[in-house]
Amino acid sequence: MVMMLKKTVKKGLIGGMSFAKDAGKINWFPGHMAAATRAIRNRLKLSDLVIEVRDARIPLSSANEDLQSQMSAKRRIIALNKKDLANPNVLNKWTRHFESSKQDCIAINAHSRSSVMKLLDLVELKLKEVIAREPTLLVMVVGVPNVGKSALINSIHQIAAARFPVQERLKRATVGPLPGVTQDIAGFKIAHRPSIYVLDSPGVLVPSIPDIETGLKLALSGSVKDSVVGEERIAQYFLAILNIRGTPLHWKYLVEGINEGPHADCIDKPSYNLKDLRHQRTKQPDSSALHYVGDMISEVQRSLYITLSEFDGDTEDENDLECLIEQQFEVLQKALKIPHKASEARLMVSKKFLTLFRTGRLGPFILDDVPETETDHPNSKRVVVL
């Protein structure tokens, strides 16, 4: 399955993506990131501990490889954020994988106070040996764009505010749905005796992403702006993943009318209307909106199940897979209630479909496979990114 997907991506079959030399180079690396990377490197030299925030759905792909050598020389905790959107069984395998490599790792939800408190307890434990001899300690939070650094900083800030109600504190970090919101390095105190400061940093990518699939995973999870790759391409890539993995076949219960299944909670109890799914944790919609979105999500999953179950081709055949994806775009347009003759209908389908994935409405996913072979082991050349 993995080799098939890599082959499909490399040949440019996902959304007609052409990465040939004459096709033009995708610019993953906005200009401000170069200066930000230099600033981060300078702060890392002074930091006593690094919290590297990664997206739990892409534990390996969301690592900034350019900073790994510098971070590996520091006390470091890998925080796999957005655990509520990740498959819990696979996530447990990932945390065990990192721990087996003697790398501290914890899965968190940056919006959960109890989850962040567990992370801070681990930070305190890691700093225990230097707390007695250092009057001031620096903890730096780093990560690629849109992995939830600012949300984590805000939660830490709230905890610090409760500890020190009269201290002078910086404003909370800005949280937005687009990558690259935080563009400056700022910090605030979270403890006395010794003084412990937490430094936030802007999200930065590597200047060049040589692995196309890694780039697509970053785009799918929202770490690369949709406009860089194109929503249609990203949606087609996600459909390829679903089909090759056979995920829609697990949604059979929707066709049979059974109110049970691996993602039943995600379908029967949606929390937001589709328009507001990009802005989670907003006010609750009324019951009619809940039913509308619930029906729409069910119809999306039901449609994908039917198209894949009735598909008589081979998902490992590039042409067959491409035909299946085209068919699924047609049924998704109907399921998402997009007018048949609407201009830019495919773009509208792509945007709504991606929103459902990114907000967990289609169920929990992890896109990266846990390394199993010796060549994928963290001590090998590849795992410089741990």
Swiss-Prot record:
Q: Where is this region: G2?
A: 180-184
Could you tell me the keywords of this UniProt record?
GTP-binding, Hydrolase, Mitochondrion, Nucleotide-binding, Transit peptide
Q: Give the binding site residues for GTP.
A: N81, K82, K83, D84, N109, A110, N146, V147, G148, K149, S150, A151, G203
Q: Which gene encodes it?
A: SIN2
Which protein family is named in the record?
A: Belongs to the TRAFAC class YlqF/YawG GTPase family. MTG1 subfamily.
Care to name a GO molecular-function term for this sequence?
hydrolase activity
What species does this protein belong to?
Arabidopsis thaliana
Residue ranges of region G3?
200-203
Compartment annotation: Mitochondrion
PROSITE patterns named in the record: G_CP (PS51721)
The record places domain CP-type G at 37-207
Q: Where is the signal peptide?
A: none
Annotated motif DARXP motif: location in the chain?
55-59
The identity of this protein, by name, is: Short integuments 2, mitochondrial
State any GO BP term from the record: plant ovule development
Answer whether the UniProt record assigns the keyword Transmembrane helix to this protein.
Answer: no
Loss of this gene results in the following: No visible phenotype when heterozygous, but completely female sterile when homozygous.
Q: Which Pfam families match?
A: MMR_HSR1 (PF01926)
What are the annotated disulfide bridges?
A: none
